[in-house]
Every structure is written in C-alpha cells, then in structure tokens.
Swiss-Prot record:
It comes from Methylorubrum extorquens (strain ATCC 14718 / DSM 1338 / JCM 2805 / NCIMB 9133 / AM1). The modification N6-(pyridoxal phosphate)lysine is found at residue 201. GO terms for molecular function: alanine-glyoxylate transaminase activity; L-serine-glyoxylate transaminase activity; L-serine-pyruvate transaminase activity. Belongs to the class-V pyridoxal-phosphate-dependent aminotransferase family. SUPFAM superfamilies: PLP-dependent transferases (SSF53383). The keyword Repeat does not apply. This is Serine--glyoxylate aminotransferase.
Length: 402
C-alpha cells in the first residue's frame, strides 16, 4: 500500500514564500474583530511607524495594501504617472521584465535598457540616459533591487548617485520585494521615492500584504495628477484614500487582520535579532551556499561576485542536464522545495532560497538535499562536498555579529 503521509516536514527553500516563524503563526491565530473599533488604532498606528525601520526610513509614508508585490508595483506607477509618461527601466531578469510589461500595459512609454541576465542595473548607463534627456521627459527610473530569477542584487546607492550626477529630477522606484527585511535597504539615504515590499519574503509572513514606503516627492507627484484627463486609472490602490484614513489608524476598506497581527510579530522578531544581525546572517548564509556550489564544481547564474544575492542563489545545471528534473526529484524524493528557473533560464538553473527565518542547520539540510538530487540525476558531484564546504564556512563565520 502506498504511503499517504510524508513524515517530517517539507523543506521550503524557494526564494519566497518563505518559512514563517512559529510565534508569527501563533500571532495570526486571532478571532475576527471590528476593524473600526476604538481599540484598532493601538495595533495599526505603531505598525505604520515600525514598518519604516525595515525600509531604512524615518521620513517616508507607509501604505499597507491587501495585495502582493505586483499590486504595489501598480500602486507606485498609477499614483505618480500619467498615460504616455516616459520611464527608464533596466531589464535583466523575469521580475524586471514583468514590471516593465506592467508599465507598458498601463500606457507608459518605457525606455528599456537591456542587460545580460546574470548582471543587474548599470548606474553608468542610467546616468548616460538621464544626461541625454535634456528636457527631463523621463519621469521615473525603475529598478529591481534583488532579481530572484537570476540571484542578482543591484547597487541602488550607486543608481541614486548616477541620478544625482546627471542632475535629473526623475523619481526613483525600487522593487525591494526580495530584499527588504533581509538585505540592507536605505530608503532615505538613497532617496528612494517608492520602495516596494511584499509580506512573503523577508517579512516572514504569508503572501497577501503589500507594503510601500513613499517619499514626500512621490506624494507631491501623486497630488500633481489630480484633475488630469490623462492620469492613470486607480481606485483600489489610490493613495488618497489611504491618506485620509491611515493617520487615525484605520483603512478605507477591510484590512487583512491576521496579517497585520503577523506583521507586528514579524517586526518584533527582526528587531529582537537586530537588523544589522539580520543582514549579516543573510550574508553568511548566502556565502555558505556559494561555497557549496563551488565545491560541487558548478557555477552561479550571477556573472561575477559583485552581483551575488544574499537571499537566493541561482545555480547553473551542467550542460545536458535539465534543472527541472533536479528540482522535481528533490521535491518527490527528499521533500525539498527548490526554486525553478524562469523564462530565459527555465530548465537551466535551480535556485536555493536562503531568505527569512533560517539558520545554519536549516541551510545545510537544503544543501544536502540539493546535493543528493544532483548525484541522483547523474551530475558528477563528490558526496558530501557541498555540505562540507558550507559547514566549514559556517563554523568559521557566526551568524550573529555580537
């Protein structure tokens, strides 16, 4: 008789959704309540302020939407821009591609800088394009901070310097869905006008809560759209409705109550660990994963170390090996969920997510499972080599700075 239950637990190592801490799951086990009660602001008002901290902001305004990160992409574009407005965007992976596609479908004129997959946004090219835009027709620059399809992180600080060097007034929009809460993010210092996050990655929650940190400059741009016949349509994602309700602790429509309680607990987890320790932990886990990849004799999709992501590693399968089979075998045989290759890299890479609530032994389990699946699929890997390399690195590099 075939087994109908798999013992143990599924090992989730995709780059999102991520593992949810037990205490966060417990925090979300709440009874329904009146979201217009006099008590409700005691939950929400501190949330608006505390959420700013993971964005590296004291000056921004936080809006929380029942949505995914994709919805917040639309919120940023539709509130600040008008049909036909020109925006500059680099395309170097599936998610930068999808954001560009959304902008085009909304009626924006997107100037696309095509970059090789495995690299990221090039600040020098952005500066060049902005310098050439003498009439300041480009209204915004769109950049994906951490491209999970290829395991690449772009340098947003350098992008800001490029915009400033060009003397250009364009808004800066940054997709931080797979970086915020895991990698250093400095919305105020980098003068990010719309910083976008989702609940299901570094914030360690289920999907369903979209977060945006909006600068004063972006708020003014949104106000400037009022009354324009060519303004982009928006209703559900309209900031004005949020601005009227949020200061009193309420929302213009029913919020996802369990996710708000979960967000409060997830932020407490991050703050108790210390954000600098969170970032350091992700850096150590990312490098340990890359040590394992090198020991296997394989390469990452990231073309050079400067592009390495510390939340996900995309690993190139050897020539002639279908990465999809490695992923399927890992799931069926070892109950390990690895990330699939997307679009241009479909069947060419498998991805190990190392984002969220993880420690050394969590990661080593994923590396062991990936290693066994590689060997089972005929890849010539020395058994134990990746685990040994990663564990050696982890022993020498504690996850906490102090």
């Amino acid at each position: 008789m075939a087994a109908t239950r798999r013992p143990g637990r599924n090992h989730l190592f995709v780059p999102g959704p991520t593992n949810i801490p037990d205490r966060v799951m417990r925090a979300m086990m709440v009874q329904s309540e009146d979201h217009r009660s006099v008590d409700f602001p005691s939950l929400t008002k501190p949330l608006f302020e505390d959420t700013k901290k993971v964005f590296g902001s004291t000056e921004g305004t936080i809006f929380l939407f029942p949505a995914s990160g994709t919805g917040i992409w639309e919120s940023a574009l539709s509130n600040t821009l008008a049909r036909g407005d020109k925006v500059l965007a680099a395309r170097f992976g599936q998610f930068s591609h999808l954001w560009i596609d959304m902008a085009q479908r909304l009626g924006l004129d997107v100037v696309v800088q095509e970059e090789e997959w495995g690299t990221g946004a090039k600040p020098e090219k952005i500066e060049e394009a902005l310098r050439a835009d003498k009439n300041h027709e480009i209204k915004a620059v769109m950049v994906v901070h951490n491209e999970t399809a290829t395991g690449v992180t772009s340098n947003i600080g350098a992008v800001r310097k490029a915009i400033d060097a060009a003397g250009h007034p364009a808004l800066l929009f940054v997709d931080g869905v797979s970086s915020i809460g895991s990698l250093p993010f400095k919305a105020d210092e980098w003068k990010v006008d719309c910083a976008i996050a989702g609940s299901q990655k570094g914030l360690m929650l289920p999907a369903g809560l979209g977060v945006i940190c909006v600068s004063q400059k972006a708020l003014k741009a949104a106000e400037g759209q009022s009354g324009r016949n060519d303004r982009l349509a928006r209703v559900y994602f309209d900031w004005e409705d949020q601005k009227k309700q949020n200061p009193t602790g309420y929302f213009p429509y029913t919020p996802p109550l369990p996710l708000l309680y979960g967000l409060r607990e997830a932020l407490a987890c991050l703050f108790e660990e210390g954000l600098e320790n969170v970032y350091h932990r992700h850096a150590v886990l990312g490098e340990a994963t890359r040590q394992a990849v090198a020991a296997w004799g394989l390469k990452t999709c990231a073309k050079s170390p400067e592009w390495n992501s510390d939340t996900v590693t995309a690993i190139l399968a050897p020539e002639g090996v279908d990465a999809a089979k490695i992923i399927k075998h890992a799931y069926v045989r070892y109950n390990l969920a690895l990330g699939a290759g997307l679009s241009q890299v479909a069947g060419k890479v498998f991805r190990i997510g190392h984002v969220g609530d993880l420690n050394e032994l969590s990661l080593l389990g994923a590396i062991a499972g990936a290693e066994m699946s590689l060997i089972d699929n005929g890849v010539k890997v020395t058994p134990g080599s990746g685990v040994a390399a990663a564990s050696s690195y982890l022993r020498e590099n504690p996850l906490a700075k102090a």
